[in-house]
Amino acid sequence: MVTFLKRFNALLFGLLFSNCVFSQETTQVTLDGLDKPVEILKDHWGISHIYAETEHDLFFAQGYSAARDRLFQFEIWRAQATGTVAEILGSRAVDRDHGTRLFKFRGPMHEEMNHYHPRGVDIITSFVHGVNAYIDEALQDPDSLPLPFKLLDIQPKHWTEEVVISRHQGLLGNISLELSTGRAVCAIGEDKVRELRYFHPHDPILTLDPLIDCDSLLNNDILHLYNSYRRPIRFQPDDIALAQYRNTEEAYETIADILIEEERDLQKRSIDDIGSNNWVVSGDLTQDGWPMMINDPHRSQAVPSLRYWSHLVGPGWNVIGGGEPEIPGISIGHNEHGAWGLTVFNTDGEDLYVYETNPNNPSQYRYLGEWEEMRVISETIEVKDARSVSVELKYTRHGPVVFEDQENSLAYAIRPAWMEVGGSPYLASLRMDQATSWEEFREASNFSNIPGENMIWADRQGNIGWQAVGIAPIRRNFSGMVPV
């Protein structure tokens, strides 16, 4: 089948206005890929108000607009999602890329994208095409690329749908707590752990399987690959290609020491003292009779910001709010019918499995008394200013193998609920964006798997509501609080 791309004028980033007074600044851009003209108005807060006549054009324009505003952020996101950060930062990012590829979603993409919306394939594909349209436009004049590209001596690369559905950015689970609890049981015993740590439910199974070797559990960096790909990216002076723009090593160390000290201070705090908040009040209790909603989801401060505001107007869509710029739709916001917000609802969506491996073949693990072959994928990581690195990605029936203790013939794998279909954080907000009632909002929330969330709702009919959403494994014979 041959698809003919029509060319239309799109009024992009035009009609800048402030305090409802329109200026005369208008820019017209002609793009391949639009069905009809699209108009984007930039207000004095920098929010893009996108008006399109088709759904395809709406999300094409959202991708184009967000990439134009946050191009460097988009490139770093793409590199994180695809496991290609080492091409930018060199050898120190190899383990990050290894971990990213190990936890890459490798399931059915059509089913995956349509989980988030009945027309998810079309929406996500349109968004990606819009992102790439701006990248192509920017590459026509590389000298005009934002300064960070010049400092790092890189250029933006095209996106694919796999970048949008990446899991790398989400608040995913509690595998570190599970491992630390298992180590504590090894070190001081179950009874002492129960005495020192609060559990809910209050009496979980903490008995370790006899197969688990406490020396191995205590003395190995089992989650190194997992943690490597989850860490935020931090640049160093020698990442800067132009030496005259580098910080001195002394200045860099001063900044790094401050960040390290802040992280240590944060780690001293109880996890119960850290978190987001939201609340919603019935109109019966407000002065004007309308429901009142407050939502304050806490995330790490970063530059550029994790949040990005948009207003999307098209057939079946009229929604404004915030989200992550690299994701189509609006994660937190309101339409003509209601408003919604979210905070994290703690669910245990990860389990650490320990296997006996075959001393004669480390790629075999024992399951139900039989040796099973791990699935092995070989990949090559390209590295800036160094030779490429070949890695083996291993998988058991339960998930990615994160550590192999060949001396003790053991392998550790993580079973993450978020690697199943529907595990991309916040993308299911696409369904919420079109909800017209509390009932429709609850139905849409059923598709929001990761992270677990407290969803709140308030609508023009005066309804308010709270719904916990998320998925967690059904554990029939273990608690998930310690490795199994």
Q: Residue locations for each model-derived region?
A:
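Bacterial N-terminal signal peptides that target proteins for export
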Residues: 1-10
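Boundary at the C-terminal end of the N-terminal hydrophobic targeting segment
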Residues: 21-23
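Hydrophobic alpha-helical segments
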Residues: 350, 403, 410, 448-484
